[in-house]
Amino acid sequence: AEIAKAVQDGRVDIGIVSGQVDTLGLQSLHFSTDRLVLATSRQHRFAKRKRISFAEILDEDAVGMHPASTLQTFLGQVTERLGKPQKLRIQLTSFDAMCRMIGAGVGVGIVPESAAKRNQATMNLAFIELTEPWSVRERYILTRDQAALPSYAQSLIDHLCQHYAAQAKS
């Protein structure tokens, strides 16, 4: 909601959001779909699993994003509904840092599949699909009026759409 409000107020030209977000009447352009996955070290007991529910991992030591991040806020809401908090051992400011800690065996963590793929070849990581429908996140670009954007902003939108369209085909 904070990103959409910044676009609506004119503080930024473009906002990128994922999941269920009130777009506040702004123009929205779908540009990609990403999935949240469970990341574990390759030695973890869940590493060989294909799918897992979020509730199953709540007894595990966890690595999370910083408390104010959109993802950690969302996961906090999910755990509140489940009535059981995550056992967070450390909270970090980037998915790459999370993957390093997870690969080192500090705990398990929820990361976007795109971040997981970026780090899989160079880190000791396994990724397991989450069974919950909320784990699939649609991503949108928000603007007040896309046609009125400066050329550099339009170029950024074009690049994002082309990049993710090519990535989806591979």
Predicted segments, located by residue:
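Short helix-initiation/N-cap motifs at beta->coil->alpha
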Residues: 1-5, 91-98
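Short beta-strand-to-loop elements that line the ligand-binding cleft
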Residues: 18-19, 64-65, 85-94, 129
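Short beta-strand-centered segments that line the small-molecule binding cleft or hinge
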Residues: 1-36, 40, 77, 103-106, ...
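Secondary-structure junction motif
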Residues: 46-47, 61-82, 149-158, 164-168
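Short secondary-structure boundary segments
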Residues: 19-20, 42, 113-115, 139
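Short beta-strand and adjacent tight-turn residues that come in two discontinuous sequence segments
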Residues: 12-18, 93, 110-112, 116
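A bilobed periplasmic-binding-protein/Venus flytrap-type ligand-binding module shared by bacterial periplasmic
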Residues: 39-43, 139-149
